[in-house]
């Protein structure tokens, strides 16, 4: 039986992530739960971005907008004494769907630089709106008064929150894979390659891309909701352009057009970031070149690098068998 690195490594990573709470409890280091909880949450957001960026070719420089919206839904509702998780989830999905539909209808009529700038403009508009909400902390942010509660299950428990986020991540990877392999995904990928030809074949590509954009926004909103419960705090910085840039880096670093890629990318990026922070306060000077080198070494990302290693391993195996 031949070893498939592109399957084995992601599965091993998921298995490792599933065991993090057990290890954190065993060594009495809750910090690991917080660190990897952040990795899982950002992996969800990166997976959502990969749907439109990796498969649809839509470079959104404002995707963190939906991360911030999901977080602010939790923060504002809990501020008013509402801790019902089902209400938090429903409002998050509704708000992100409406904002995603509105911004998508306007931005998807353009391509290239124009699309990038429009998505960035919308994100910055909501960023400054959040800064102006003095009742909810303004630029200083807002502490989350109460964690989301689903019946008797409260996300105030770090282990419960971690496993909920991990389950959402696994669901997103599985559902995303099914979605892009279906007719819907074929149209999205075809539109990325040649939108005019797809329209000539009778496919309403704008409608398909809008649906993908809205789905992506809603999933990212769920990540924001989980992030607010993780940090017990919401801030306009969650939807800043720098946060959107980080999501793009995670997707590109992990590998475009592969739902396991963003999981690898978010894990690698946040672990490297955390490691460098412990070495020097000027960690960004080292971090930037490291990311650039990583992308240059493997233009298809870490997931693509696994494929390259698989090919080399197969060639070496055949060479050894030929000599034998």
Question: Where on the chain are the PLM-derived regions?
Answer:
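Transmembrane alpha-helices and adjacent helix-loop boundaries
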Residues: 1-324
């Amino acid at each position: 039986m031949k070893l498939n690195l592109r399957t084995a490594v992601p599965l091993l990573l998921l298995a490792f992530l599933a065991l993090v709470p057990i290890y954190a409890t065993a060594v009495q280091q809750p910090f690991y739960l917080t660190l990897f909880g952040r990795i899982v949450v950002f992996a969800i957001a990166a997976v959502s971005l990969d749907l439109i960026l990796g498969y649809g070719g839509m470079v959104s420089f404002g995707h963190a907008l939906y991360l911030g919206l999901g977080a602010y839904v939790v923060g504002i509702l809990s501020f008013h004494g509402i801790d019902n998780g089902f209400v938090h989830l429903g409002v998050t999905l509704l708000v992100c769907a409406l904002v995603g539909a509105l911004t998508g209808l306007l931005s998807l009529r353009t391509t290239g630089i124009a699309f990038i700038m429009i998505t960035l403009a919308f994100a910055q508009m909501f960023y400054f709106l959040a800064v102006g909400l003095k009742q909810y902390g303004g630029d200083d942010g807002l502490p989350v008064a109460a964690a989301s509660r689903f019946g008797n299950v409260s996300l105030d428990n770090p282990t419960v929150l971690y496993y909920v986020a991990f389950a959402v991540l696994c669901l997103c990877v599985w559902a995303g894979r099914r979605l892009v392999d279906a007719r819907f995904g074929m149209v999205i990928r075809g539109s990325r390659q040649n939108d005019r030809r797809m329209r000539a074949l009778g496919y309403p590509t704008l409608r398909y891309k809008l649906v993908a954009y809205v789905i992506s926004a809603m999933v990212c909103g769920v990540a924001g909701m989980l992030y607010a419960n993780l940090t017990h705090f919401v801030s306009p910085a969650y939807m800043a352009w720098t946060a959107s840039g980080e999501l793009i880096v995670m997707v590109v670093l992990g590998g475009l057009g592969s739902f396991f890629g963003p999981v690898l990318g978010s894990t690698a990026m946040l672990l490297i970031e955390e490691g460098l922070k412990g070495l020097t306060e000027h960690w960004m000077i080292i971090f930037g070149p490291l990311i650039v080198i990583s992308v240059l070494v493997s233009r298809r990302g870490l997931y693509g690098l696994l494929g390259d290693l698989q090919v080399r391993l197969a060639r070496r195996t055949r060479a050894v068998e030929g000599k034998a």
